[in-house]
From Swiss-Prot:
Protein name: Gamma-glutamyl phosphate reductase
Family annotation (InterPro entries): Ald_DH/histidinol_DH (IPR016161), Ald_DH_C (IPR016163), Ald_DH_N (IPR016162), Aldehyde_DH_dom (IPR015590), G-glutamylP_reductase_CS (IPR020593), Glu-5-SA_DH (IPR012134), GPR_dom (IPR000965)
Source organism: Listeria monocytogenes serovar 1/2a (strain ATCC BAA-679 / EGD-e)
Gene: proA
The protein's enzyme class: oxidoreductase
Domain of life: Bacteria
Xref: Gene3D superfamilies: Aldehyde Dehydrogenase, Chain A, domain 1, Aldehyde Dehydrogenase, Chain A, domain 2
Amino acid sequence: MTELIKKGSAAKEAAQFLAQASTKQKNAALLNLSNDLLTHTASLLEENNKDIIRAREKGTPETMIDRLRLTEERIKEISEAVKQVVALKDPIGEVTNMWKNEAELTIGKTRVPLGVIGIIYESRPNVTVDASVLCFKTGNAVILRGGSDAIDSNKALMSVIQDSLEASGFPRSSVQLIEDTSRETARDMMRLNRFLDVLIPRGGAKLIQTVLENATVPVIETGTGNCHIYVDKAAEKQMAIDILVNAKCSRPSVCNAAETLLIHRDVADAFLPEIETALKEYNVELRADERAREILKDSKAATESDWEDEFLDFILAIKVVDSVDEAINHINKYGTKHSEAIISNDYATGQAFHQKVDAAAVYINASTRFTDGFAMGFGAEIGISTQKLHARGPMGLTELTSTKYIIFGDGQIRN
């Protein structure tokens, strides 16, 4: 708890400094950080390799090791992502609305930082940089708590970040890492109301549920991605195959990857054999319901948990449905309100799907893999929010701000 209190107090002070920093000052510091990450590539890879070796010794699946791995190319991508954040418009100070009331007061609404943000996350060390940069750009101090499996990578990245920001004239406590990765410290952080203004968990269902059950700090939930592809009877076969392969196989370990295929009974016989052939190239394990197994002889029988799980692996659950309404009901029962897709050339069916499915992002004839700040065209994001309060969907710079009212008067008093 001592580490949390010390770093929480320092973060509060840093937040006051950051709130006054100009966009020019923040961008200059971020450009320096982008260069410093490249300069320290060798040492970052050396520390990351310690995490990789430890993960292999524990028998961690390769798909999860991929989330943990840094490479020279990935560090270049991280560095470039920092530059992309520099290019984004700074929302701080933006006046979103202004009007006069009956008392002739001029009332303005402007964007301000949230304050001190806490982020608890798991294996991906790139989150250490992404989260730091986004919070910094929006004038927020941030306290990060990564997983034990990436601790050496995170400590190395944090050292580069803090040294770089300090060299640019900012407090080292603008961005901090909790190095104690114990569950007890994580739970203490969830109750750090005295210092944290908001807590954002990024990770699997178990982590997010733990935060929701234990946190007294306000939480923005970045949900897991049990994403579905529904292939309608009016779907174009090759389009359906291409989208499914991309959504499942391009990067199965991320939250916007597809986990379940729902397919209309009228096209199941014609589509499923070709879908199976396409997925075999990636060694995807198929877990199918009874009707789908009659067509897919090499598939395994799906269990109830298969409809609920976020596999994050080359595994796909498959179910044959009688109608779009059955598909919608299945998604609303088992989905995590993240990203859902329909493949159909019938306009009315597509409209019904997007109106009835409860999710942050609903796709018509496109892959779920586009649920990402850069892919959607508004820049880097801190995570994908699956809740409805404060933010929903990819959380970019604007979602890391609050608002303040500024009222200009000329001596008015209220009668």
